[in-house]
Amino acid sequence: MGFTLAIVGRPNVGKSTLFNRLVGRKLALVDDLPGVTRDRRIHDAKLYDLKFQVIDTAGLEEAANDSLEARMRAQTEAAISEADAVLFVIDAKAGITPADSTFAEAVRRSGKPVVLVANKAEARGSEAGMYDAFQLGLGEPCPISAEHGQGMPDLRDAIVELLGEERVFAEERQEEAADEVFTPAAVGALVGDDIEDPDAEEIPAYDATKPLRIAIVGRPNAGKSTLINTMLGEDRLLTGPEAGITRDSISADWEWHGRKIKLFDTAGMRRKARVQEKLEKLSVADGLRAIRFAEVVIIVLDATIPFEKQDLQIADLIIREGRAPVIAFNKWDLIEDRQMVLADLYEKTARLLPQVRGLRAVPISGERGQGIDKLMENVVKTHEIWNRRISTGRLNRWLEGVIAHQPPPAVSGRRLKVKYMTQVKTRPPGFVVSCSRPDAMPQSYVRYLINGLRETFDMPGVPIRLSLRTSDNPFAGRAKKKK
């Protein structure tokens, strides 16, 4: 194995659950009681193309030297010294505790490279915990759900970025491993990589050379496989008039204008009531995993019968999963009055999918290869917006102007005070607003802020997350401390 990772953190944040997921089986005891793991376990692990050793440690405890907890802490310190890097796990649902801060300082003192892992990120309210995590001084939190397997692609990317490709691939760089990097059957994804500290002066430019993961979804027989075959220039996938020919998610490597792309053709996604065969149920589940693993999702609609109820359900699922959607109106070669039909389709897109204003939609013919370049141009632009980060200074200057022009309404005779705003993640863009009474803030005003963000910072066509919290500005006074 090329390198070793130690999983550390206070008790009951999900370290052993993450360990079990990385090793592929339940080797570590998992329970809700703190301190279940009393010693460290070392095992071979794999995360897509990364092969390494992982150490599961006892939860860090503050304790007297002669106690069991002290010996558990000694085991953890030994694991840190043996490891090449540390996965420091916090509970995003519970937020940051004094114990997290104490042991984050201990990990920093070790000098080992650290990935801050925000576990239980699928839980409601976890955005606030990720917001608090900045105060640990361990960098941008990588949100995951170890229990459900969400966020694993982002964790993989964070490890590679931390240690460098030469280090992580020093011993093994085989073709089979490369092919397994993006196997959708083992994947569930949330959000978050390529993110800088909110206090950073410079925002990193979009990397147009980075490989791109695209899932192609739609109702059965919408032309998904035909589109991929045209892109690849070969009959890689079985196509035909029968709905449901593609039974599973099939991946293919492609290049567009020199950029490497992994394409996923998913099984046609039917309504649940019509998914009867066990094999087809598995195929649809595989398609859902492919969506979660993708960065951009191309929704293929049959232009002759667009916006069926199931089309809207698929689009809503993609938006809720936080992926970057682009619509392809396929079979455009069958449309006669194209200008009138296209205007009607654009109007329906805006009206039927109001969750994401400015959703990009392109007419194509997968069979004839028409509109593919235009489609890909929109895919790349949407991906860039999905990865966008806005500096804290710009956000708060904008917020001041918004409040001056249109302050939040009074609730029960009391004004709501909006104090501060920061971006806590990208992929999709996620923001937290600090205010006096989050529970009292009308959802109409939250939507007003989201729409303002989208318009002011040019973010059409991607989901935007915005949550409210009561805590004070965590970055206030930081500049004074540096003096």
UniProtKB/Swiss-Prot annotation:
Residues 388-472 form the KH-like domain. It comes from the Bacteria. Keywords: GTP-binding, Nucleotide-binding, Repeat, Ribosome biogenesis. Disulfide bonds: none annotated. Transmembrane segments: none annotated. GTP 1 binds at residues 9-16, 56-60, 119-122. GTP 2 binds at residues 218-225, 265-269, 330-333. Residues 3-167, 212-387 form the EngA-type G domain. GO terms for molecular function: GTP binding. One of its GO terms (biological process) is ribosome biogenesis. Belongs to the TRAFAC class TrmE-Era-EngA-EngB-Septin-like GTPase superfamily. EngA (Der) GTPase family. GTPase that plays an essential role in the late steps of ribosome biogenesis. Associates with the 50S ribosomal subunit. This is GTPase Der. It comes from Brucella canis (strain ATCC 23365 / NCTC 10854 / RM-666).
